[in-house]
């Protein structure tokens, strides 16, 4: 197998994350990554034998007996998806990324391995990594065998994409795991969106029909609490304040 010398970049990666030059949010995930780094980074294999890979994947250039490890080539989609290697103008427009949004189960690949690969290539690093938790269904892990998997497309078909976005931002803790139930979803949908926002829009629209209203073209100041929540990726707290 071929290996990437990740150990060479241990001190640099640790300093980047420790000083928030590469910001990892929330703090618990930052601590988790730093603990992993300080335990000692080992070089990792970037290829598999063709037999082990069951003949599936991208061959290592110059060595047809080896297949590139999925995580090694797959992470680069963040760049190739925005022009890297074929459209330099597009790549410079979108890279480096302001934020990577990832699940907590793949944090090491993004906050350690990917960063080491970019440092090795002399390429710009993403500015921050926001790590979210998992979503359960009715207090249980989603499972086909349990039949409790939530199909987001079914929810969107019935309620619309904005309603689902609202629920996920408002109800799911940004810095931890969350839970989805149709009961709670419909409760928020009716209370916050239909009755709250919906009634407000309906009443204002009715006034517009009968009265000539003038609006001041000024930015709405939502307060420092909302701003701070958004900067910390605490979308649930920000929406609660609004």
Give, region by region, the residue ranges found by the protein language model:
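Long, non-coiled-coil amphipathic alpha-helical linker/lever segments
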Residues: 224-236, 240
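Acidic, turn-prone loop/beta-hairpin segments
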Residues: 212-229
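Structured secondary-structure scaffolds
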Residues: 1-216, 240-242
């Amino acid at each position: 197998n071929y290996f990437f010398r990740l150990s060479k970049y241990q001190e640099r990666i640790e300093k980047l994350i420790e000083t928030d030059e590469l910001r990892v949010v929330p703090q618990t995930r930052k601590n988790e990554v730093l603990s992993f780094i300080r335990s000692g980074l080992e070089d990792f294999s970037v290829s598999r034998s063709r037999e082990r890979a069951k003949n599936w994947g991208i061959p290592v250039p110059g060595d047809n007996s080896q297949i590139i490890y999925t995580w090694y080539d797959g992470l680069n989609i963040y760049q190739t998806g925005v022009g890297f290697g074929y459209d330099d103008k597009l790549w410079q427009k979108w890279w480096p990324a302001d934020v990577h949004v990832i699940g907590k189960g793949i944090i090491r690949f993004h906050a350690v391995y990917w960063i080491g690969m970019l440092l090795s290539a002399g390429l710009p690093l993403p500015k921050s990594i926001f790590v979210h938790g998992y979503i359960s269904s009715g207090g249980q892990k989603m499972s086909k065998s349990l039949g409790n998997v939530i199909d987001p497309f079914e929810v969107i078909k019935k309620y619309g994409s904005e309603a689902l976005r609202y629920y996920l931002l408002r109800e799911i803790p940004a810095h931890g795991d969350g839970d989805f139930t149709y009961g709670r979803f419909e409760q928020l949908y009716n209370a916050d969106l239909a009755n709250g926002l919906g009634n407000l829009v309906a009443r204002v629209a009715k006034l517009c029909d009968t009265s000539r209203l003038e609006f001041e073209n000024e930015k709405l100041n939502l307060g420092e609490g909302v701003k701070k929540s958004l900067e910390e990726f605490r979308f649930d707290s920000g929406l609660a304040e609004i």
